[in-house]
Amino acid sequence: MKDSYISIVIAYLMVTFILVSSMPIEGEKGELRPHRLSCPPKYASYHCFNGKCVHLVAQDEPGKPYYSCICDKFYIGERCDTLDITNPDYFLKGQSSTQSSI
């Protein structure tokens, strides 16, 4: 009985999460936040140095393109051009392979 109740609660939470995560999110002034699309090829190749270029489409200005970067791990900056050595994981990145071979 307890197991079936837990299964029902878990299923309910999963469905709720899926429904909520697929809903559009409103910004501070009530406008919808932009959707992400892949960058056009002419921007994708040079806009982000160490990351992925995304094309943002603002719903209040659909004709105006915005380009942004989603940086790879350990990189920061507007164009992912700065190595983030302040990230503690940066110094641990090589240790996992060393420890597993011992």
From Swiss-Prot:
SUPFAM superfamilies: EGF/Laminin. Residues 43-81 form the EGF-like domain. Residues 1-30 form the signal peptide. One of its GO terms (cellular component) is extracellular region. Disulfide bonds join 39-53, 48-69, 71-80. This is OMEGA-ectatommitoxin(02)-Rm1e. GO terms for molecular function: toxin activity. The keyword Signal applies. It comes from Rhytidoponera metallica. It is found in: Secreted. Its main location: secreted. The keyword Disulfide bond applies. Expressed by the venom gland. Belongs to the EGF domain peptide family. The lineage of its organism: Eukaryota, Metazoa, Ecdysozoa, Arthropoda, Hexapoda. Keywords: Disulfide bond, EGF-like domain, Neurotoxin, Secreted, Signal, Toxin. It comes from the Eukaryota. Ant peptide with probable defensive activity which acts as a potent agonist of the mammalian epidermal growth factor receptor (EGFR). Mimics, both structurally and functionally, vertebrate epidermal growth factor (EGF) peptide hormones. In vivo, intraplantar injection in mice causes long-lasting (several days) hypersensitivity of the injected paw to both mechanical and thermal stimuli. Its long-lasting effect is unusual for venom toxins whose effects are usually immediate.
